[in-house]
Amino acid sequence: LKDDAWHQTSGSFWTARSYAKLGRYDDINFWLKRASNNPNSFYGMLALEILGVDEKIEWVEHTNLNKNNSTILNIPAGKRIQTLIQVGFADELEKEIVHINSILNREVAKESIQIAENFDLAYTQLKIVNKLEQFGMDVPTYLYYPTSVWKPRDGYKLEKELLHAFMHQESMFNITAKSKDGAIGLMQVLPSTAKFITSSKDVKRSNSNILKNPEINLEVGQEYLTYLLDLEQVSRNLIFLATAYNGGPGNLQKWKNETNYMDDS
């Protein structure tokens, strides 16, 4: 696990927790500081909070591609990308950048992420962020959290940030995503769930292909989140919400009943 920062961080955090239970307080800070070295992870954020470190995230404004010193135009796909930028064909531009993702070198990746950011290509941006990590680059935190151009057909009824968090986790903003269990689109909605939860007549009457429409997918996903938030076993708790969304409210209740938390809070 020496190259796996995420597991190192979670391991360090729980080591600190173990030392706290043992009363070995001199060891706690060492392991919390080690966990905090990965501030983009869940356990890294928890470690920073416990240490009392106010780690400010710089949400840098969009930057423009430097066309006078562009490495990307020197690769075969470069001219096609330049043309697509000029005519503003965002969908085709995204496909082209994703297509060259496997051959990106460091400089091409840096320029590609600028294009993705400027055109709000959230799925592409996350793929390139992963590539930059492979190159060992220190990626600015804000690049891990792109925003989507899509919104629910009937508008946002819940916080926009909440839906973005679920899109990020469920599909990485990939509108064509489909799981082995049949969950579809940005919010990875199961057709059976859509039929159960939706108030939309066209969704009830249509086959699952309607969920490939990102605005309808977000509409149904938002309705399901609203339904779950009001359940007694969720009680507007975000951790329980995420559990119920992925595993179902029935499983959430079962796990709550069966879990011995052993005073862990």
Model-assigned labels for residue ranges:
Residues W6-S10, T15-S18, L22-R34, M45-L48, ...:
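Catalytic glycan-binding domains that act on GlcNAc-containing polysaccharides
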Residues T63-N74:
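TPR-adjacent "capping" and linker segments in tetratricopeptide-repeat scaffold/adaptor proteins
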Residues T9, F13, N74-K79:
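Alpha-helical tetratricopeptide repeat
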